[in-house]
């Protein structure tokens, strides 16, 4: 665990340091855990895309504790570039981010849905089953969003989507 003073020093290095300092700061911030989440998100909100890239990499290392705060910041921030880098961080977290990202698709969050869709496509295989479950929703729009996302995943999602549609068609015909 890294204390607040050290985290602040590392974030300053991330913002102002030469390449090697930024790389080391990214690694140490990523290893700092939850205490570094808010300062990293603040750096992403205030910084340029280089800083966002390094901060996103550190957030990927931190993983699950960063998911909720990242989603909250994405909702609050109107900056498209910030949202894009935050989405990349969520995609880099893989399995841990699937459930909250699928919830954004299910709830048709107008602000974050496109970012969630992109992240889920990047995550790939771990997102397939949760999206297949969304296709069982009573809401046709939710079914449509899930099917479209599976299709856009390419081979990873299209095969399971096709099988689900065939199985669903058979079940409907047997009623």
Question: Where do the language-model regions lie?
Answer:
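Solenoid-like repeat scaffolds
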Residues: 76-78, 136, 170
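Structural detector for internal amphipathic alpha-helices that build alpha-solenoid repeat scaffolds
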Residues: 1-4, 19-34, 42, 50-64, ...
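N-terminal intrinsically disordered, low-complexity tails
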Residues: 9-12
């Amino acid at each position: 665990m890294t204390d607040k003073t050290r985290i602040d020093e590392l974030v300053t290095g991330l913002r102002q340091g030469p390449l090697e300092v930024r790389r080391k700061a990214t690694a140490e911030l990523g290893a700092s855990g939850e205490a570094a989440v808010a300062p990293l998100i603040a750096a992403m909100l205030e910084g340029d895309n280089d800083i966002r890239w390094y901060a996103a990499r550190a957030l990927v290392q931190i993983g699950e504790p960063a998911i909720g705060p990242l989603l909250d910041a994405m909702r609050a921030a109107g900056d498209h570039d910030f949202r894009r880098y935050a989405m990349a961080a969520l995609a880099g977290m893989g399995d841990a981010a699937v459930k909250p990202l699928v919830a954004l698709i299910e709830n048709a969050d107008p602000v974050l849905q496109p970012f969630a869709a992109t992240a889920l496509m990047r995550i790939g295989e771990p997102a397939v089953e949760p999206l297949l479950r969304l296709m069982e929703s009573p809401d046709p729009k939710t079914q449509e969003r899930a099917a479209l996302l599976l299709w856009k995943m390419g081979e990873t999602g299209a095969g399971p989507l096709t099988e689900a549609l065939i199985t669903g068609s058979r079940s409907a015909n047997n009623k």
